[in-house]
Amino acid sequence: MIAELLLKEGKKPAIISRGYKSGLEKKGGVVSDGKSILVSQKEAGDEPYMMALRLPTVPVLVGKDRKVSAKKAVALGADVLLLDDGFQYWGLDRDRDIVLIDCMNPFGYFHALPRGLLREPLTALGRASLFLLTKSDKASDEEKLKIKRVLRHYGRTTPILGTAHSP
């Protein structure tokens, strides 16, 4: 969604993912150079591979060292870098932090790993530039209001938008 909007604005985005448990996670690599897919789904990991299929003109890179991936993305012509699951990654400067909140389990049992699903405590939400409520079409108005109240506690003026999943 964000990459598509950037493309419409004339930007050249690239997506950088860790590629967790993929064949390329440790050494890193280019899944797609924005022209063709260069590795298998097993090497890329499921999500990066699906992103490369869905966004054929957008470079997709994976690897634990996201600084290396970022440099490769810029070398491929990217002028905007989108980090998949990058909120808690501090190795790169950023202009915006967009946090996705799943309306079906919005706050990961309110605890960080291993007790809950959060990568950081909820107080980290104060750094967010934008909240996107995913699957908001499946949540009731009352559920969305509860989520927004929690988000307002941490990001008082941070914009909150709803999104819906579609095939």
Regions found by a protein language model. Give the residues of each.
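Phosphate/Mg2+-binding loops and adjacent switch elements
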Residues: 11, 20-155, 162
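A conserved segment at the C-terminal end of the G1
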Residues: 1-16, 20
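Beta-strand-loop-alpha "switch" segments that mediate conformational coupling across diverse proteins
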Residues: 160-167
